Amino acid sequence: EHTILVALVGQEILRGKQIREGGVSTDDWLHFIISLVCHDIGYVKGVCRMDRDREHLYATGNGEEMVELSPGASDASLTPYHVDRGKLFIEERFGKNRIIDAEIIKRNVELTRFPVPKEEDHQDTRYFPGLVRAADLIGQLSDPRYLKKIGALFYEFEETGQNKYLNYRHPDDLKHNYPKFYWNVVHPYIQDGLRYLS
C-alpha cells in the first residue's frame, strides 16, 4: 500500500515538474517510476539472490555480508539494511539491462535512506533523487490511515530498537510527536516536491 501511495505521489511530482519546467525525458520518467516502485523492495525477504529463507539468512547489500534473523521476525527487522538490499536487488535485476540504467535507480533509492544522513550528497531536494525521497515521505505522511497505523509503526520501531533511539515508550509518543517530526525532520526535504504538486 505504501509503495502505491509513493508511486502515485511521485508521478504527480514528475507531472508538476514537467508542467512547470519541462525537460523531463522519457528516460527520466522510466527511471523515476522504477525507483519509486523499488524504493522499499529491500524489506522483502527472499528478494536478493543470496537470501536463504530456510536458514533465516539475508543479504545486507554490503558485499557478501549476511544477517541472521530470528524465526518469526517481521520484514521490519530488515530496516537497517533495506536501502542497501534494495540497491542490490536493482543491480541484480537491472544491472545488465541495455535500456535501464541501474546506477540512476540506485542513486534515487539511496536518497530514501532515513534518517537522512548529514553528508552533502544526501541533502538534494531539487533533482530526481531528492524528489524520489520527497515522494516517499509525502506518500507515507499523506496516507489517510497514517494515524491508525502508528501502533504498528511503533512495534516495528520496537523490533529494530529504533523506539529507544527516538525515545518513544509507547505508540502515543509517535502520535504526540507527529507535528514536531513533520516540521523539523520531514518538511525540509519535501518543499520542492510540494511545489511541483501545487
What are these regions (language model features)?
Residues 2, 39, 82:
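Histidine-centered active-site/metal-ligand motif
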Residues 3-6, 20-21, 48, 55-57:
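A glycine-rich, hydrophobic loop/mini-helix early in the fold
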Residues 6-13, 79-96:
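An active-site-proximal "capping" alpha-helix that borders the catalytic cofactor pocket
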Residues 47-72:
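Post-HEXXH active-site segment of zinc metalloproteases
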Residues 86, 104-108:
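A cyclin-like helical interaction fold
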Residues 1-8, 67-76:
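Active-site flanking loop/helix segments enriched in acidic
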Residues 31-35:
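Active-site alpha-helix of zinc metalloproteases
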Residues 12-28, 38, 42-49, 92-99, ...:
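Divalent metal-dependent phosphate-bond-processing catalytic cores, especially two-metal-ion Mg2+/Mn2+ enzymes
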